[in-house]
Amino acid sequence: MEAPTDKVIDSAPEAAAGAWRLVADVGGTNARFAVASNEGSISLVTRYSVDQHPSIEQAVSAFLDELAPHGYSGTPDAACFALAGPIEGDEVRFTNSTWVASRSRLSRALGGSAVDFLNDFAAIGHAIPHLESSDWIQMGGGASRVDYPIVVLGPGTGLGVCLSLIHI
């Protein structure tokens, strides 16, 4: 297997405490994995091409192997996967990939850790209230309106859409 295409290695203070969480953003082209702290900070971000691994479980295993030199051992306390496809039941079939994600298989691969799934653009919708004003780019004419819904469109391997009724 070839090496990951992108890596951002930060300090990992949670490693010493032993507790950590895995977060992932998995699309039809790329899978990004990271460690999330209790405070919500993200570190040790690693990106793999979906074509590098025959399954999501094997990509997760490769990521876990990458964490060992940074003080992480074992498996996470919990994992959350933002997935490019409809979330229905235990399995998610990706819109533009041959991978199939299963909560039960991923939980077994993670030593019994709790595993949660959400759609990748639903994850963006959940993140909107946590953005700073410097994270926003005004598009089109006129001023932004605080009390209006927010729409997010994202071209990738497919086209993601999110409507957030959370007003900021």
Annotate each predicted stretch with a short phrase.
Residues 159-161:
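Active-site histidine-anchored catalytic micro-motif
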Residues 70-117, 122, 126-135, 152:
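Short beta-strand-loop/turn "lid" adjacent to the catalytic site in phosphate-handling enzymes
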Residues 166-168:
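Conserved small/polar residues in nucleotide/adenosyl-binding loops
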Residues 60-72:
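Short amphipathic alpha-helices and their capping/turn segments at secondary-structure boundaries
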Residues 12, 16-62:
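Short glycine-rich, Thr/Ser-proximal phosphate-binding strand/loop in the N-terminal lobe
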Residues 3-16, 117-150:
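Conserved phosphate-binding catalytic cores of ATP/NTP-utilizing and phosphoryl-transfer enzymes
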Residues 156:
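Extended, Lys/Arg-enriched charged tracts that mediate electrostatic binding to polyanionic substrates
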